[in-house]
Amino acid sequence: MKNIGYYNGETGLLEDLKVPFLDRVSFYGDGVYDATMALDGVVVFAEDHIDRFFNSCANMEIDPGIGREELQHLLTDLVAKVDGSYHFVYWQVTRGTAHRSHPFPEGNANLWVMVEPEEKNLQPAPIQLLTVEDTRFFHCNTKTLNLLPNVVAAQHAKEAGCEEAVFIRDGFVTECAHSNIHILKDGVFVTHQADNLILPGIARKHIIASCERLGVPVEERPFTKTELMDADEVIVSASVSYTHLRAHETLMN
């Protein structure tokens, strides 16, 4: 298949599937998600992403109606049905289908999955970053579907000719619109600590582990916009891109 979608047990091409009008995602963005890549049929860091997904579910008090192992098998099975060897894998759960009312409805959650082929980008290239004010809410560690501030920031970056937007909160760098950001200065890897102001990125986790294996000092702490501008290197990381780390970024105020 050229792509595949899944909704509560029904599968088909993404352009053919339909979801109920009363799915709570329509009214409230009431759900959580996660995403990664698959390479040669293997969902990359699947356990890490699934653990984070279930943590998001717990934070938002959503029962996904599926277990970890069952979800991992489902993702792997769907990947196997799509053409190509490199895929974008996305899944989300919403808090069911019901007439619009703020309190939680009775009934089961809705599980969505989509898998699409992607092209590998293995060529290193510099990217440009735009700094923007971080006005998001204080639950950035939960991967909810409420992404409007990220969407607007990403659009402003695009309009400025940049590939990513960097959030600045009270003078400190938090993360980007859809990735984590880190700096290298005097041989030290510096990254914002994993608290409620950033998403605990899976790529970030494995970069930190690699630094520890290689003997590179790691500081998990807030760093300022000035430190960002003065860094020896800026590293942007995300699980849904597969490329060499870029050793040079241009930053725009």
Residue ranges and their predicted role:
Residues G84-W91:
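Ordered, amphipathic secondary-structure segments that act as subunit-interaction surfaces
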Residues M1-D77, T94, H99-R246, L251:
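Helix-start/capping segments and mature chain N-termini
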